[in-house]
Amino acid sequence: MNSPLNNGAASTGNNVASIGAGTASIGVPFTIDTEVFFRNCNDFTARFPEQAARLGLNRQETALQCLQAVPPAYRLLQAKAKGMERTPTLSVNGSFVHSKYNPQEEARRILVSDFFQTAEVQSRCIFTGLGLGYLASQYIERFPAAEAVIVEADSNVFICFLASRRLDSFFRHRRLSLLIGIQPEEAASFLASTGWNSKILFKAPIFAEAYRQWYKTFFTLLERNKMKNSINAKTLERFGTLWLKNTVKNLGLLCSTAKVSCFKNAFSDAAAVVLAGGPSLTAHLEIVKKSSKGFIIIAVDTAMRACLRAGITPDFILSFDPQYWNYLHTAGLDTSKSVLISEAAVFPAVLRQCYRAVFFSNSSVPFARYLEGEGQNGDEDYTLAAGGSVATTAWDFARYIGAKPVIMAGLDLAYPHKQTHFAGSTFEEAVHTRSTRFASAEQANFNSLYSAFPSLHQDYAGSTVLTDRRMLLYAWWFESTLAKYPEIKTFNLMPRGVLIPGMSACSAEDFVGLIGGLPRTAIDERLEAIVKNAYSQTFLDGCGARERQLAASVKTMTEAAADLAVQAEKAGKLCRRLAECGGEEGTGKSGKSGNGNRTREQAALIAQLNTLDEKIKDGFAKDLVEVLCFSDESNADSSVPPMAAAEKVYGRICLMAQQVHEIFKKR
């Protein structure tokens, strides 16, 4: 093989090349066999054609150009250990990604570390940072049935990897996923959709300065997703049954209530002001009240009391919380001039109030879809986003009706000046009403401030403001959603809370210039026309057919819940029998004569269990289990034997199904 050329970042000869050979020497340049490089590119293209085309590695001429374009800071060098001259190591910006002496031995030592000794990691591992792939290659060689997910932000490192050696066995690995040179949001989204946790995430050091921010963003997104899943798990555990009970109590309204789909893009020529319930709302209401220009007013239920006190009548009120305490925000108020936007799982008393009209969005709870039916008001999906706060749903409704721009008021997502709510809010009044010498209002306010993992976060003024983990999750929802819909210009009116990238601050003067476009009279007339059209005689005449369809759905769900309870009980008994006949370590009788019989019995029991699992995972049962038996994986007790843990899960499903059956029977 010829000696490497030293005339650039990546130098090529007849069938040889070197990367970074022209820089100051920190080692002997490794000579690349371009035939090996092209062969690896072909294998990569065959396995991941879209990524190969995006990176320009799907054709020899463009692949060679990519190899030649590798910057001088990336250097393939010969390993320094004796006999390792044909083994490359990689240097980036003068720092070695692997051992400069023996990178293969280094990978072997990492692979026998504690991190790789768990069964979970040995079945699936996520590598953030590939380097020359020594660790990943040894991992899939040692655990051939394992799934390997590799995230490498730096495409130059990946090109060095392809140029390092033959990688036939690497690309033949059946359960291999590569995410090369993509945006951190895409990588985080992939892991969110396929499942991940920190126990299987192996973080490699970052040597390219240009990609430090990439990995910082990526890990931040993963943590946000982890936090979201944790909060969702607690929410489902707390409210799953309540959602179902409320939905069943509200069944009568499902057939006679129109859907929000009639508002889609209905106000594309109007601005919208969304009134959230943060501490700054009181000051914002004065600005909204003084304006004489026309704009849509969308209020969350928590802000309704303050709106009426300020003399503001919202066009829309949004209420989605299933709890009684949330109903108190609007209880006793005159809501007759506003349109309610809600869903079937809301607390029933909310729907008994008088409104200009009521419209339902699709429920965000999966099992409710079986009751809502299809085709009642068009076949399109009219589910409003549920970012954890009614303010996120209100913004999405403003987007749904086509409003531009959208101006958020009272959206602090923080505790400016240590205020938890706006003056005169239901929470504040309740705190003062219940305060005693031993449980003062100040103590209640302190508990509210410091019970949800408080922290300081950057605000719009460049300083910091007190917030908490839950509020930051809402802020992150706005940040990611605004990036998804850049055409929806959104502003934050005189903000005092957490800085939300993509949501610019808006002064009182700016507010006057942003609103307007559609006169108030035109807004009222259009709203009236939409309501009349939605509740037309044709719609009212169709209530009978929808009631019959709903009755059939209720009957099916009642029977399905009873059947699910039976199936889960059978599955629990099978788990117990599996453990008793030797399905758990340390159980079962000894003796060779019984081994064959026990093996056959175990196989038969497992086959029966698999059949029951398929039934449980089907249709309505699957959605019930997902919502009402949701469990946070981080709380799993690894010390419990698998069959005992499975029996516990089936017991929980059985109990849940029995409860659901009773709820439907008592309807």
Region locations from a protein language model:
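N-terminal donor/sugar-recognition subdomains of glycan-related enzymes
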Residues: 2-8, 20-275, 279-296, 305-309, ...
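A short glycine-rich beta-strand->turn/loop micro-motif centered on a GG-aromatic cluster
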Residues: 151-154, 300-302, 407-412
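Catalytic or ion-translocation cores adjacent to nucleophile or general acid/base/metal-coordination motifs
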Residues: 294-304, 309-354, 362-364, 373-376, ...
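Active-site/ligand-binding-proximal alpha/beta "capping" segment
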Residues: 349-413
